[in-house]
Structure formats: structure tokens, C-alpha cells
């Protein structure tokens, strides 16, 4: 897709990476100008390979791109994806590595919770880098808020199907 104002093609690519035997972390995001930082959650899964992790990162970053475009959030699409076969033992290293990668990007990527990360992880990450968008130090549980939105959509869809509105 071409940005009509800048005439630049907006593509998703790897902005930063860390690879080791126990943990690999990839920041995959759109290459938009600095005034449109990328946004997407930090996902930690037991991917079989780094390639599988990267492929999921590209898929998810493109979905985040569509989401941010649809809702005109001002963000570009991005995702932080991490691979480990021992998820519970790498959490501290994940937070440390991710903070360094985010800091090196100097605000081009902002992350939050996703699969196998929670607000406690985001609070630790936020102590190391300001590039976190989550319900840090809040009484609001962002996961509950997201779940309520999904439930609302399902209820609406169910009602619409019953009334044959589509």
C-alpha cells in the first residue's frame, strides 16, 4: 500500500532482533515515518523455529496495521514476537532483551500485553523503557476490558443472526 501523502510504500519488516538458544525476540513493524510509531503486543510462544516465529510476527504486524488504519489510531502496525521452549524460565530475560530492543528503536515501536505476557510483565518492562502502552499502574485490567469487547461482539453477532440482519 502506498501512502498518498509521502508516496512511500508502507511495508512490514524486521526492525530489531535478538537470537539465542533459549530465547529469540523479533520486533516486526511497518516502516512508517517517526510520527507514526508502530504498536502491537509482546507475544511469547513455544514456536518450533525462529522462522515460524517471524512468519507469525509478519502476519500479526500486518493485522495490527489493518487495525490501526481502520480505527485511525495514529499508530502503524507492529508486533513483538518471542520464541522459547521454556516460557516460564525466560521471562526476566525476555523483559530485559525487549527493553533494550525498544530503547534502541528510540520510540519507533510501542508494545503491550499479548499471549503469555501480562500487566506484571509490562510494569517490569515500563521500569526499563517508556515504550510500553498497557494498563500500567491502573485499576483497569486491560485483559478484562478486551474480553468484554469480544463478548459484546459475539452477543451482537448472535442477535443479528437470530434476526437475520445480514
Kindly give the residue locations of the regions a language model identified.
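Short, well-ordered amphipathic alpha-helices
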Residues: 61, 153-155
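Single conserved hydrophobic/aromatic residue that forms the stacking wall/gate
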Residues: 156-166
Amino acid at each position: 500500500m502506498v501512502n498518498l501523502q509521502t508516496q512511500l510504500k508502507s511495508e512490514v519488516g524486521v526492525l530489531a532482533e535478538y537470537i539465542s538458544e533459549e530465547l529469540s525476540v523479533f520486533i516486526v513493524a511497518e516502516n512508517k515515518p517517526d510520527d507514526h510509531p508502530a504498536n502491537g503486543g509482546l507475544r511469547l510462544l513455544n514456536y518450533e523455529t525462529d522462522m515460524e516465529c517471524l512468519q507469525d510476527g509478519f502476519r500479526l504486524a500486518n493485522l495490527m496495521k489493518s487495525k490501526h488504519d481502520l480505527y485511525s489510531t495514529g499508530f502503524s502496525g507492529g508486533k513483538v514476537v518471542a520464541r522459547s521452549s521454556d516460557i516460564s524460565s525466560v521471562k526476566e530475560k525476555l523483559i530485559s532483551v525487549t527493553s533494550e530492543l525498544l530503547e534502541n528503536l528510540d520510540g519507533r515501536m510501542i508494545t503491550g500485553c499479548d499471549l503469555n505476557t501480562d500487566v506484571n510483565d509490562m510494569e517490569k518492562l515500563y521500569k526499563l523503557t517508556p515504550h510500553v502502552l498497557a494498563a500500567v499502574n491502573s485499576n483497569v485490567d486491560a485483559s478484562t476490558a478486551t474480553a468484554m469487547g469480544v463478548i459484546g461482539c459475539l452477543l451482537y453477532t448472535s442477535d443479528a443472526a437470530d434476526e437475520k440482519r445480514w
